[in-house]
């Protein structure tokens, strides 16, 4: 295993939220993806698209961060990496069986336009697996909220209901959803790690992942810091 693979594993998998977040989306997608063409929208270095590729998918990752993609090409399971805008995807209609997007839509000025493009390139019956910032209690801690939004360029936040409406308008039916960091304590943890720790903080807090997961299982699936959704194109 190359050093770049070790660094990518540590950055993506040893992480208090990404491990569960992207791992859940991939679990929903399925273990056997042979014969499937999968697009990761705003996939950075393509690590998670690469994990879909390991399951047999013909995986493609798009992003505008050239440096991340240059790094991604050094990974052992690198997908096809294409530099392009998520709001203007360079693919024909119905090109993909599944679309993955991990906490990307909140960074777009026009989240609806990004969903337009995802729906366009998705085959009928194909599915979207995505997550988004919710920050349902963020107004309780305005300094943490504002710092998080400024640090990560969060333009909008979404709930499963607001995503359901946007998706329905684009011919997509919500199949299921799941909130993460559902309790007040874990939501504050999420914002505090974001504000004061950044990526290093999220990585260092990885040992807390089982405790956050346990708290989530005991709380209603109604609110949280992040929402995961699966939707199917009509």
Predicted regions and their residues:
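Short alpha-helix
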Residues: 155-171, 177
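Short, glycine-/aromatic-enriched active-site segment of Class I SAM-dependent methyltransferases
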Residues: 133-154
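A short SAM/SAH-binding and catalytic strip from SAM-dependent methyltransferases
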Residues: 98-109
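Short N-terminal helix/helix-N-cap motif within the alpha/beta-hydrolase-1
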Residues: 108-113, 139-140
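Conserved N-terminal segment of class I S-adenosyl-L-methionine
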Residues: 1-88, 100, 115, 224-227
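A C-terminal cap/extension of S-adenosyl-L-methionine-dependent methyltransferases
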Residues: 143, 176-234
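A short glycine-rich, Lys/Arg-flanked "PGG" loop and its adjoining helix->strand segment in the class I
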Residues: 112-127
